[in-house]
Amino acid sequence: MIKILQFGEGNFLRAFAEHYIQAANEKGIYDGKVAICQPRKNNAVINALKKQNNEYNIILKGRLNGKIIDEVQHINCIEKCIDTVLETEELESTFCSHSLELIISNTTEAGICYNGNDKAENFPNILFPAKITYLLKKRFDSGKSGLVFLPVELIENNGNELKNCILKYAKLWNLGDEFINFVENECSFCNTLVDRIVTGKVEYESDACAVSCEPYASFIIEADEKARKVIPFTKVDMGAQFAASVLPFRKRKVKILNGVHTMSVLAGYNAGFKIVRDMVNDETFKAYILKGLNEEILETIDLDKEQLTSFAQSVIERFNNPFIDHKLLDISLNSVAKFKARCLCSYLDYYNKFGKAPKVLSFAFAGLINFY
């Protein structure tokens, strides 16, 4: 029975969302299949999955809770793949099915946007939020219940942004107050924050759709009571949790994961390192990273200390992934903008709290100046 429709067939969702769905089904806490469609015209992955009976493998490689993980997870939770362009009737039928309850999407950061020139009659050749508006109107007209939307696009307030776009299209297309009320009161739009390094497509036996990723995963979901009853992922011990707001977790991710990257990369490159793993395996440089992380960055974040410490430890563990050669020069791109967004906030917060400059973050800034 199809309970989930997913807009997005790329490596990230197949290594992230399907992993959660598969785990929930295997543990007996969920009984639902997913249908996948591509949000754009390119149907190469959809066709490749169809040739494999909609099955593929996730290759999990990395460190988790102190252990080296090198595992394969077979995925068979996909009921069908739908070509958005060539199989519009199938897409509409699935969207209007009685069993459907959850929509997952990843249409890139540019996917959730509004275009006043989009017209309903041009479906499916319209933007993703316009497609959803068109399909939701079909579902509303068929008398079906509202849906829960779980966008994982990496923009702030992704659920709210999707909802706002849909409401704009509803007004643009004169879909009526009853439909607008349906969207606002019968549907739930969740803000989310996701985190997993997906290294991409890999060769695995005869599987043309195999994808590789780290074992670590985090899925923070800002959901109302209706959505919490529908979403099964928090029942699986894989880093998914409901939260009153994703904003503190976004701040945590930016300051710790992204911030430590930026704090260490240029100083590390200046010290002669080439990849991230070598930095954290050098005792002297690791001490530098831990001092900046524990004594400066963590001191500026107002969250549960136990959770902060656990997350910080997982970040260092992820940096030491023996299967990923993460090049410092690749991470160094746009470092000035990255330092401003990821490290300057911690620098200023520390200064305002303690009345003095943080030594490690100051050294990181010196490394930035020296690099350029």
Where does each model-flagged region fall?
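Substrate/ligand-engaging "lid" and interaction regions
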Residues: M1-Y372
